[in-house]
């Protein structure tokens, strides 16, 4: 077992270094660059799997594969990386989705070297976000990750690409200022100056300061997840992005917000989390219902799926605020599940647009008659999105519902209301998804569209990509332990720590978190 091998550093730096070689590769038509990038992606994903198999213990809740190299010793600033149950499944997801996104980018012919350079740089940057254990380093990789996304949106996007890219960078960069302010405050608080996340988490912050820090982080990560009302950049970004960018936005970037909420808000500020938990639940319900209703009203296919993503992220908020093992486990599983399902749907949006050259549902209709493979893929992936039993979304949402329903941190009235409203959102999901399928595939034929000579069925590359995404979607739905065992040890430990901060009185006089006036002015110390 190669426990001393720098697995995570290699995984992060390999695609970045490989991207620097792209400008010197002789290539006229882009074919060499495509294959080179795909091979780099496959090798890096293989290294991720090797690291998981040889150096990661699923029963250990602590950080593993830890590396730490001095950077600025005077400030205890290090290149520090590690992986636990919160980060390892998302690192694997990143490698998987990004490699498929590189394959999805096969039709890109405009400036292919620059495009694949940005894709590979983003590959390493995304994994760095999930692996780094230094607050300042986290802020740096969080910011650097924005640059490739902005360039891909602004260069290869649609007609309103500059507007969408500018809105994306303004929202996300503005939110990042709150990360920097909170990180510096935590690092310089107390007698020791340190940016190490584990050291920062052990500091005894004043309770009111915890609340301010939690609010700052929440604003920053609410943009990325996204959470209403800081979500408006996402439909615009998806509306102008290409298929590979779609896959990375839905599959990876949104999960960065959920991961950071768990890692920093819940993990480092558990006392404040106990106070903000009802707010997260309410925001989660708003996300589910509002986005589902808005998605139903959309006539643009990309924007419809984008609002669907926002709706599904609401379950992540409810699960992480449930204070139960199964609820928190469901939140993590929902992030993984939606990463796969969202990537598949947006890839199909791109494949459909390449053939029909329209995103307006009113201009579609009857395309399933000529594209039977596309018809089958759209139907299957939509069933996964509406949480059909036997698929990953069903398991994740049921776990969140059960976790919240069995939580003793909330009053019965509040739980019933939340579950009822969330169920309304769940019911709305098949309504807008099935109506979408009808308008694309089953509706009256658009003669100009159906008779168009380029309206060809899915090619083997497209079938392969969707097949690769459906295998884990169905696999998790049938046997969720294949994924939950990776993170269960960590989420159980985190839940126990969070419950220590919940002012619950055992017996008939227990305090519900929905009554904030009954919370103590200072939460109990973490044992």
Curated annotation (Swiss-Prot):
Transmembrane parts of this sequence? 5-25, 35-55, 90-110, 112-132, 136-156, 168-188, 211-231, 242-262, 274-294, 310-330, 331-351, 386-406, 416-436, 463-483
Can the keyword Mitochondrion be found in this entry's annotation? no
EC number(s)?
Answer: 7.1.1.-
Instruction: Write out the catalysed reaction.
Output: a plastoquinone + NADH + (n+1) H(+)(in) = a plastoquinol + NAD(+) + n H(+)(out); a plastoquinone + NADPH + (n+1) H(+)(in) = a plastoquinol + NADP(+) + n H(+)(out)
Annotated keywords: Membrane, NAD, NADP, Plastoquinone, Quinone, Thylakoid, Translocase, Transmembrane, Transmembrane helix
Instruction: Tell me the compartments it is located in.
Output: Cellular thylakoid membrane
GO biological process entries:
ATP synthesis coupled electron transport; electron transport coupled proton transport
Q: Does the keyword Transmembrane helix apply?
A: yes
Task: Write down any Gene Ontology CC term.
Answer: plasma membrane-derived thylakoid membrane
**Membrane topology classification:** Multi-pass membrane protein
Task: Identify the enzyme class.
Answer: translocase
- GO MF terms on file? NADH dehydrogenase (ubiquinone) activity; ubiquinone binding
Q: Which HAMAP family match?
A: NDH1_NuoM
What is the protein's known function? NDH-1 shuttles electrons from NAD(P)H, via FMN and iron-sulfur (Fe-S) centers, to quinones in the respiratory chain. The immediate electron acceptor for the enzyme in this species is believed to be plastoquinone. Couples the redox reaction to proton translocation (for every two electrons transferred, four hydrogen ions are translocated across the cytoplasmic membrane), and thus conserves the redox energy in a proton gradient.
Say which family it is in: Belongs to the complex I subunit 4 family.
Protein known as: NAD(P)H-quinone oxidoreductase chain 4 1
- Taxonomy-wise, where does this protein's organism fall, top ranks first? Bacteria, Bacillati, Cyanobacteriota, Cyanophyceae, Oscillatoriophycideae
